[in-house]
């Protein structure tokens, strides 16, 4: 059985309680859907190091020094493991679209207005329950 692919994503929350989401680019699976920024773990990389690297590569964010709190762990069959980390910002940040994707800050209530890939359903439900 092949080793599952591990994907890490950041639920980045600003000082106004808004969450950062990014639109998946046209050349990727789930194109046009929205997601929490992140990506694949490289061999020998920790979850946290991979997430910080992906945030730098995709959005030009240097979040070293911010606290990453594990928020959710899920499996998509046997092929993919999803790990989400919550980052509550202690300073203003300005994401950039380094890979051409759109991004925006949304409230927890607004998040249901966006289409997310099906594997994100459980973490979205957890976010909705936390805001109720």
Describe the predicted segments one by one.
Residues 62-71:
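A short coil-to-beta-strand element that immediately follows conserved catalytic motifs
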Residues 1-19, 40, 71:
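Conserved N-terminal beta-strand and adjoining loop/helix that marks the start
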Residues 5, 14, 71-94, 102-106, ...:
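Active-site-adjacent beta-strand/loop module that shapes the phosphate/pyrophosphate-binding cleft
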Residues 18-19, 103, 116:
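A residue-level structural signature of the nucleotidyltransferase/glycosyltransferase Rossmann-like core
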Residues 108-119:
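C-terminal structural segments of small proteins and small subunits
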Residues 41, 111-112, 124:
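A generic structural signal for short hydrophobic patches within well-formed alpha-helices
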Residues 18-57:
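Conserved Nudix-box catalytic region and its N-terminal flanking loop in Nudix hydrolases
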Residues 119-132:
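Charged phosphate-binding loop/patch that engages nucleotide di/tri-phosphates or the phosphate backbone
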